[in-house]
Regions:
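Intrinsically disordered, low-complexity terminal tails and inter-domain linkers enriched
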Residues: 285-343
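Residue-level marker of intrinsically disordered, low-complexity segments enriched
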Residues: 9, 141, 151, 296-299, ...
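Short, well-ordered beta-strand elements within core beta-sheets of diverse protein domains
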Residues: 193-197
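Acidic, Ser/Thr-rich peripheral helices and adjacent loops at domain boundaries
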Residues: 240-244
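Internal mixed beta-strand/loop scaffold within catalytic domains of large alpha/beta enzymes
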Residues: 96-190, 375-378, 387-388
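Short, surface-exposed beta-strand-loop junctions and turns on beta-sheet-rich folds
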Residues: 130-132, 177-179, 236-238, 394-397
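C-terminus-biased signal that marks the final domain/tail of proteins
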Residues: 1-110, 198-219, 224-230, 234-236, ...
Length: 410
């Protein structure tokens, strides 16, 4: 079950521009390769929906929104372009790939599944599913020089995706789909980057997310040592979704907040997101000691040193009320272990024969845009400011396949 070790970029720089230049220089070849795939993907998806895309114009439109919200992110992308020797609009397009694909009418079969367990030691993780043709277009990273140092995974040329920062603020990432999605606002990947580089607390992270003027939908799950919440973002607004009464957050690729679910696009097109959500909700009940309890769940604490730390209640909540703090654990039923790597892969390793394809495998043949795979499995432990990353789906993970990352000090 050995998986190849991923490149880890150590990004440094005392200004956004310098951090971008450092990223561009280090990832130059990978950015060039990734752009070629995305350029073809944009065109293929648009053609399949009888649409024509002006990708430079769309990318620069998102830049204008970003400059108004967080100009330092634009400066960082400008640095990436310079370091990589690429036109600026191509780097902007990579960071706005979710928004541009929304304009193209992209189907999102596969996508991501996330689990978080709150309690005395809140932990979580996810499958990151994307196009098989981009399986080599991502890397691990540590970033210093911003307000908060952070670590995580991202795609070549994209500033951030999944990660945790030195303040112990982690973010997990699931794309959603809304009828109003477009490429006019701040790209969701840049919103995640802003949280990782600036948020010093759970409340700050949630405040940044709910204040971001996005134009494409996503749910970013904020995880700290003692609390968690999913923040649903859409052109129609935002909503904070609290854990259920057992302390669990189960996320796939549809809205849970009723006000935003009225504009649901993904679930109407592809009901498999509901199948994954239903299966995972059943599995976490088993993990917590329900019918068919998995007694081997204690092995995570022994194997990885993660201590012990529970379907869905949705709706707006204030940042400080989204989950109980360490001294207010009423209503949360602590189970046999934290959600470390071993427990995470047992819960996420599900295929079609199990009732839903949480762990995705690409078909051998097929066109670009239709070959989805789980490219990475990520476990996050905010109390330790750390992640563990497995290159591939949870069904291929083992103790020796995880790469540990710790958020650096700025």
């Amino acid at each position: 079950m050995n998986s190849p070790r991923r490149t880890t970029l150590r990004i440094t720089g005392d200004t956004p521009r310098r951090r971008g230049e450092d990223r561009g220089r280090q990832a130059r070849a990978g950015i060039t390769r990734a752009w070629r795939v995305y350029e073809e993907l944009f065109a293929t998806v648009a053609a399949g929906n009888a649409r024509t895309l002006d990708v430079p114009a769309l990318a620069l439109r998102t830049v204008r929104a970003t400059r108004a919200w967080a100009p330092e992110l634009v400066a960082e992308m400008e640095g990436v372009a310079e370091g990589a020797g690429m036109p600026f609009w191509t780097i902007a397009a990579l960071n706005a790939r979710t928004e541009i694909l929304a304009e193209a009418g992209a189907p999102r079969t596969g996508e991501c599944s996330t689990l978080v367990r709150t309690g005395p030691r809140t932990t979580g993780g996810q499958c990151w599913d994307w196009h098989q043709e981009l399986a080599d277009a991502w890397h691990l990273q540590t970033v210093t020089g911003d307000t908060q140092g952070f670590a995580g995974i991202t795609e070549h040329g994209i500033l951030a995706k999944i990660g945790v920062n030195e303040a112990g603020v982690g973010v997990l990432f699931n794309i959603l789909g809304h009828t109003d999605d477009a490429a006019t606002g701040v790209p969701v990947h840049l919103v995640a980057r802003q949280v990782l580089g600036a948020a010093a607390s759970f409340a700050e992270a949630v405040g940044m997310l709910t204040g971001a003027p996005v134009s494409a939908s996503t749910v970013i799950t904020v995880v700290t040592a003692d609390r968690a919440a999913s923040v649903e973002l859409a052109p129609a607004g935002s909503a904070v979704v609290a854990p259920d009464d057992r302390g669990w957050l189960v996320r796939t690729n549809h809205f849970l907040a009723p006000a935003l679910a009225a504009g649901e696009l993904r679930g109407r097109r592809e009901a498999e997101t509901y199948d994954r959500h239903r299966l995972l909700t059943e599995r976490v009940l088993t993990h917590d000691g329900g019918p068919g309890t998995d007694a081997s769940a204690v092995s995570d604490a022994e194997t990885y040193g993660w201590e012990a730390s529970g379907s869905e209640v949705s709706g707006p909540a204030t940042p400080d009320a989204a989950t109980p703090g360490p001294d207010a654990s009423h209503g949360v039923a602590p189970g046999p272990s934290a959600l470390g790597p071993d427990a995470l892969v047992r819960l996420l390793a599900a295929h079609r024969d199990d009732g839903a394809e949480v762990c995705c495998h690409a078909p051998v043949e097929g066109r670009l845009g239709g070959r989805w795979a789980t490219l990475a499995t990520v476990a996050v432990d905010p109390a330790e400011r750390s992640l563990r990353v497995h290159g591939g789906g949870p069904c291929s993970a083992g103790p020796e396949t995880w790469t540990p990352l710790t958020a650096p000090r700025r």
